[in-house]
From Swiss-Prot:
Species in which this protein is naturally found: Caenorhabditis elegans
Description of the deletion phenotype: No obvious phenotype at 20 degrees Celsius or 25 degrees Celsius. At 20 and 25 degrees Celsius, double knockdown mutants with wdr-5.1 have increased fog-3 expression. At 25 degrees Celsius, these mutants have increased fog-1 expression, reduced brood size accompanied by 42% embryonic lethality with 100% of the surviving progeny being sterile. Surviving progeny display defective spermatogenesis to oogenesis transition with 88% of the gonads only containing sperm.
Protein name: WD repeat-containing protein wdr-5.2
An example molecular function term from Gene Ontology annotations: dynein complex binding
Record flagged with keyword Repeat: yes
């Protein structure tokens, strides 16, 4: 039986830890919404379930010119903090405001957005088969090409030198960020590869697929170390904890599993009574808790050692698409997520109250990421929006 009582202040400190670590967040592709979240999943054809154009071929030109930045939000960009019933919490309110916008960042829907662990760059992945790198003044730097179909996920290595990506082309690729070259292609999955990440030391790569398996690869030679038939539906998200000892996986089967990364064995299984499809999982900064995004308009914070839910965050809309959530610890201790109502939501980690909503996108917000060292949030949305928005807070 899940428990939804508030965690103590000590638990909150344990959740966020003393450092943010360098794990990349793991946004999940918006390209395949869940039509019928039931034991017999009905999954739309990739790239078609939400009425977007089919993925294009390789060869889309890299953007040679710098996209225009807009630092002045229009009248519809309301970022005032949501009124709070508890005045004593006012000093904990985030004050995010729109400070920059990259229009037409990609040619198709943006499936992921990530800051590099060193905080110097931002990456964005898209259904247009490209990953673009942006400087922190949000000026275009370069494009990484190599996949034949749309990008479902990408993640940075902890030293910010490499990017691993996965695609509907059933491949996992590793790119050298400095040169922009694909340096390794990992083959083995038999269906769309939905998620991928490096372990903190950069020695392992994990991936999850619509073939219902998790693969752990040697990052040096690209060989498969483990192929794990870990779920009964597509694997939607994978994430290492901060020391790399454990790998979490989430699936449309409604289950989160924790794996020993050295043996490939399952050490914990998390499932609640409702078991809605899981679309994203992320370890807390200290690696002791897991934040799971669910296709029933909830985020759940699990104490996976005790197999219980510590917190449940609600108020946003998420019942159709794969939307990622993040921890923000550079200012207050917050949970950040996109939403199908075109907004970004920010919750107080401890009280579960919505502190602020960020308005400005005109389609479902699939991707958010929090800068590792500054109070900055990046967000991106489905077609036809295709804009990256940058929000900054003074608190």
């Amino acid at each position: 039986m899940e428990q939804r009582g508030r965690a103590s202040q000590d638990e909150e400190q344990a959740i966020v830890g003393a450092e943010t670590g360098s794990q990349p967040s793991l946004p999940v592709s918006p390209m395949r919404p869940i039509i019928a979240p039931s034991p017999a999943m009905v999954l739309p054809t990739p790239g078609h379930g939400m009425g977007i154009p089919q993925f294009g071929p390789v060869g889309l030109p890299a953007q040679a010119s710098t996209p225009m930045l807009s630092s002045t939000p229009g009248p519809s960009y309301s970022s005032a903090p949501t009124p709070m019933p508890n005045p004593s919490a006012a000093n904990l309110w985030p004050t995010y405001k729109l400070v920059a916008e990259i229009p037409n960042a990609h040619k198709k829907s943006i499936s992921g957005i990530k800051f590099s662990p060193d905080g110097r760059y931002m990456g964005s992945g898209s259904a247009d088969c490209s990953i673009k790198i942006w400087r922190m003044d949000f000026v275009y730097e370069k494009t990484l090409m190599g996949h034949r179909l749309g990008i479902n996920e990408f993640s940075w290595s902890s030293d910010s030198k490499l990017i691993v990506s996965c695609s509907d082309d059933k491949l996992v690729k590793v790119f050298d960020v400095s040169s922009g070259r694909c340096v390794k292609t990992l083959k083995g999955h038999t269906n769309y590869v939905f998620c991928c990440c490096f372990n903190p030391s950069g020695t392992l790569i994990a991936s999850g697929s619509f073939d219902e398996t998790i693969r752990i690869w040697c990052a040096r030679n690209g060989n498969t170390i483990f192929s794990i038939p870990g779920h009964e539906d597509p694997v939607s998200s994978v994430c290492f904890n901060r020391d790399g000892a454990y790998l979490a996986s989430g699936s449309y089967d409604g289950i989160v599993r924790i794996w020993d990364s050295t043996t490939g064995t399952c050490v914990k299984t998390l499932i609640d009574e409702e078991h809605p499809p899981i679309t994203h999982v992320k370890f807390s900064p200290n690696g002791k808790y897991i934040l799971a995004s669910n296709l029933n308009n909830t985020l759940k914070l699990w104490d996976y050692q005790k197999l219980r839910v510590l917190k449940e965050y609600t108020g946003h809309e998420n019942s159709k698409y794969c939307v990622a959530a993040n921890f923000s610890v550079t200012g207050g201790k917050w949970i950040v997520s996109g939403s199908e109502d075109h907004k970004v939501y920010i919750w107080n980690l401890q009280t579960r109250e919505i502190l602020q909503t960020l308005d400005g996108h005109n389609t479902a917000v699939m991707c958010t990421d929090c800068h590792p060292g500054q109070n900055i949030i990046a967000s991106a949305a489905l077609e036809p929006d295709m804009r990256i928005k940058i929000w900054r807070s003074q608190s």
